[in-house]
Each structure stands twice: as structure tokens, then as C-alpha cells.
Amino acid sequence: MAKLQITLTRSVIGRPETQRKTVEALGLKKTNSSVVVEDNPAIRGQINKVKHLLTIEEK
């Protein structure tokens, strides 16, 4: 399976609680933090919900 590197590029300050929890569920804590995750439909759904806050690269 492919892997995705996800970076939180914008702050969650002032964002709805659902978006904050989604960012936390992806394993991101601070701005500019990154994680590498497996590419699957569940992760894609989470990314789609907060894509305006993230930068995604395929690894």
C-alpha cells in the first residue's frame, strides 16, 4: 500500500471541534508537525474533512 505524508500547515485555532478532533485523530498536534500514514479510505475521508489545513505528499 502507498503511504502519505501529512503536514499540518494551518492552525486549528478558531476551527470547529469536529475539525480539531479529526486533526488529532490523524496524529497531528502542532503546526508544521508531520506523520506518515497508510493510504486507505478511512484516512482519505479524514484528510478530505480538513484538507484546507493540510499539505499531503505521496511517499
From Swiss-Prot:
Domain of life: Bacteria
InterPro entries, A to Z: Ribo_uL30_ferredoxin-like_sf, Ribosomal_uL30_bac-type, Ribosomal_uL30_ferredoxin-like
Pfam families: Ribosomal_L30
UniProt keyword annotation of Ribonucleoprotein present: yes
Any one Gene Ontology BP term: translation
CDD domains: Ribosomal_L30
Keywords carried by this UniProt record: Ribonucleoprotein, Ribosomal protein
One of the record's GO molecular function terms: structural constituent of ribosome
Record's GO cellular component terms: cytosolic large ribosomal subunit
The keyword Ribonucleoprotein is annotated on this UniProt entry: yes
Family designation: Belongs to the universal ribosomal protein uL30 family.
Quaternary assembly: Part of the 50S ribosomal subunit.
Protein name: Large ribosomal subunit protein uL30
Native organism: Staphylococcus epidermidis (strain ATCC 12228 / FDA PCI 1200)
